[in-house]
A protein has these predicted regions:
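Solvent-exposed, polar/charged alpha-helical surfaces in well-ordered, non-transmembrane soluble domains
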Residues: 45, 56, 66, 111-115, ...
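A short, structured surface patch at a secondary-structure boundary
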Residues: 49-50, 55-115, 120-126
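Extracytoplasmic
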Residues: 25, 33-35, 42-45, 63, ...
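Extracytoplasmic substrate-binding proteins
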Residues: 27-30, 120, 130-168
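Second-shell loop/turn segments in exported
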Residues: 38, 44, 56, 99-103, ...
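N-terminal secretory signal peptides that target proteins for export/translocation
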Residues: 1-5
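Bacterial N-terminal signal peptides
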Residues: 9-19
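Bacterial Sec-exported substrate-binding components of ABC uptake systems
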Residues: 11, 22-59
Length: 168
């Protein structure tokens, strides 16, 4: 079938290249709730979640917990221990997600965030505002940050945040 010894190698190389190109999703642009245009590859597979774990897990559905590589866990485990226990019982992998600290008590760590190598960071609007001085480090590392907002308590923000989570 292959008369020239390099023909087989060339065909194999082309197959690998085509396969790789099919898997590499081109970046898309999404608009977060602050009106910021954010470019990222979808679906994100290594997510850091700053807040709204119940909302994220409800929208992300099956497999959503496996995509989390870091969270602000301390406040959730302390303020809602019974709910946290139920989540861990149904999705045991959540117990292994690293705690990156809490923005409210200024323990959130950009270093820990960078160390888990996320391809997306999802923050609440208030977290984004509080971390404004530190976020350029994520941008310099090529890590997109998307802002959602359920604290506004408006239908518009809830819908925008939920639709955005569904895209990510």
């Amino acid at each position: 079938m292959f008369r020239h010894p390099l023909a087989k190698l060339l065909l194999l190389g082309q197959l690998v290249l085509v396969s790789w190109m099919a898997q590499a999703a081109p970046p898309v642009e999404v608009e977060d709730v602050m009106g910021r245009k954010v470019s990222l590859s979808l679906p994100a597979s290594r997510i850091v979640l700053g807040f709204y774990p119940e909302d994220y897990l409800a929208v992300a559905g099956e497999g959503g917990a496996e995509r989390l590589v870091g969270m602000s866990l301390g406040w959730f485990m302390k303020s809602r221990p019974a709910i946290w226990s139920l989540y861990v019982a149904s999705q045991p992998q959540l117990a292994k997600v690293p705690d990156l600290g809490n923005v409210q008590d200024q323990s959130f760590s950009i270093e820990k965030t960078l160390a888990v190598k996320p391809d997306l960071v999802i923050l609440a609007k208030w977290q984004y505002e509080a971390l404004a001085a530190d976020l350029p480090r994520l941008e310099q590392a090529g890590i997109p940050v998307v802002v959602i907002d359920y604290n506004a308590q408006t239908l518009t923000q809830h819908m925008a945040s939920t639709l955005l989570l569904g895209k990510l």
